[in-house]
Regions:
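ABC ATPase "signature
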Residues: 69-70
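C-terminal coupling/interaction segments
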Residues: 99-139
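Conserved H-loop
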Residues: 38-47
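Helix N-cap at the start of a conserved alpha-helix in ABC-type nucleotide-binding domains
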Residues: 20-22
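Catalytic Walker B motif of ABC-type/P-loop ATPase nucleotide-binding domains
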Residues: 9-13
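Short loop immediately C-terminal to the Walker-B catalytic DE motif
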Residues: 15-16, 48
């Protein structure tokens, strides 16, 4: 059943399987729809680049657990990627480190930006990197 003038769209994998041109057109339609403050879209998708273009808020579920639920821009400003030595990583407050990868060449960590000393450079994180770090940390 379709409503004539819906105020909310509930979509599951709405852009999955579409070629890039059509996907871009569909995303533009979604953005036009949400320009009206009374319109919202609840979307589930594995295509994270689409979520970055469409969503204002992100809820990230993994194996039935809600890992994140926050405004997208806040998430991206709150978290960052730190590349450093293993020794530098050990000197950080453990609460600042949300996930990490250790290799023979050093460490890369998903961190809370505001808890990292200004002497260390924290790089921006994408939603995809954020999700991958969080999932792999739980594996």
């Amino acid at each position: 059943m379709f409503l004539k003038n819906p105020s909310i769209l509930i979509l599951d994998e709405a852009t999955s399987g579409l070629d890039p041109i059509v996907r871009d057109e569909v995303i533009n339609l979604f953005n036009e729809f949400t320009r009206d403050e009374n319109h919202s879209i609840l979307i589930s998708s594995h295509i994270i680049s689409d979520l970055e273009k469409i969503c204002d808020y992100i809820a990230f579920l993994h194996q039935g657990e809600l890992l994140l639920c926050e405004e997208k821009d806040l998430l991206l400003s709150r978290y960052g990627l730190l590349q450093c030595s293993q020794e530098q990583l050990l000197q950080l407050n453990p609460a600042a480190i949300k996930a990490k990868r250790i290799s023979a060449y050093g460490a890369e960590a998903l961190v809370l930006r505001d808890q990292i000393p200004p002497t260390l450079t924290v790089n921006p994180v994408s939603l995809e990197e954020l999700f991958i770090f969080l999932i792999k940390e739980r594996a």
